[in-house]
Amino acid sequence: MAHSKAQRRGLLIILSSPSGAGKSTLAKRLRAWDSDISFSVSATTRKPRPGEVDGQDYHFVTVESFKQDVANGDMLEHAHVFGNFYGSPKGPVQTAINEGRDVLFDIDWQGAQQITNSDLGKHTLSIFLLPPSITELRRRLESRGQDDAETISRRMQKSWDEISHWGSYDHVLINEDLDETEEALKTIITATRLRRIQQPSLIEHARALQQEFEDLS
């Protein structure tokens, strides 16, 4: 990478899409591309699925504990989805961006708005993935073989609510080809890391230039 962790402030990279549009696959590819991108491990009140590891896939917590964290301001964002609570613990995110590491969020539009409006919002980069078509979106959901017909129908009904908020994101990509979309994401992230606000060391550099100019005058 062009800028080391010591030279920049980390990004909160928000990746949103309706279920089946490819965000989980692309999130994994981005983490494989750059070790400075870590995945935000969400807290949830739902039961663990087979193979899921507490603290790695999710932080599995009780409803009471979750609500207490929200009340204490310890959740960067939170939502109630399909009968369960989900949220992003704030502490680990704050630590990561202060150390120059990016944090990737695989969340819906409601969570994206909460993060963007938070005290860390100025460091966000939000990207929305659109499917090529609704027909293709359904085909992808069915081909995954993870959900029954009722769950797929419910996800499809929710998909338009998610898609309708595409205009509130910094960047929007149509994910027709995974490889092309991955390259576009890398380009966006690389450019955003160069924003002035992500490079606090520029202030000292500018002061040094001013001092040098005055010394030479």
Curated annotation (Swiss-Prot):
Q: Which SUPFAM superfamilies match?
A: P-loop containing nucleoside triphosphate hydrolases
Q: What is its EC number?
A: 2.7.4.8
| Residue span(s) of domain Guanylate kinase-like | 10-190
The protein's matches in PROSITE patterns, at most eight in alphabetical order, are given as: GUANYLATE_KINASE_1, GUANYLATE_KINASE_2
DNA repair: is it a keyword of this entry? no
Q: What class of enzyme is it?
A: transferase
Which cysteines link up through disulfide bonds? none
The record's GO molecular-function terms, alphabetically, read: ATP binding; guanylate kinase activity
InterPro entries reported in the protein's UniProt record: GK/Ca_channel_bsu (IPR008145), Guanylate_kin-like_dom (IPR008144), Guanylate_kinase (IPR017665), Guanylate_kinase_CS (IPR020590), P-loop_NTPase (IPR027417)
Where does it mainly reside?
Answer: cytoplasm
Q: Which keywords annotate this record?
A: ATP-binding, Cytoplasm, Kinase, Nucleotide-binding, Transferase
Compartments reported by the entry? Cytoplasm
HAMAP family, alphabetized: Guanylate_kinase
Q: What does the similarity note say? A: Belongs to the guanylate kinase family.
Entry-linked PANTHER family:
GUANYLATE KINASE, GUANYLATE KINASE-RELATED
Which protein is depicted?
A: Guanylate kinase
**Organism the protein comes from:** Ruegeria sp. (strain TM1040)
What is this protein's gene name? Answer: gmk
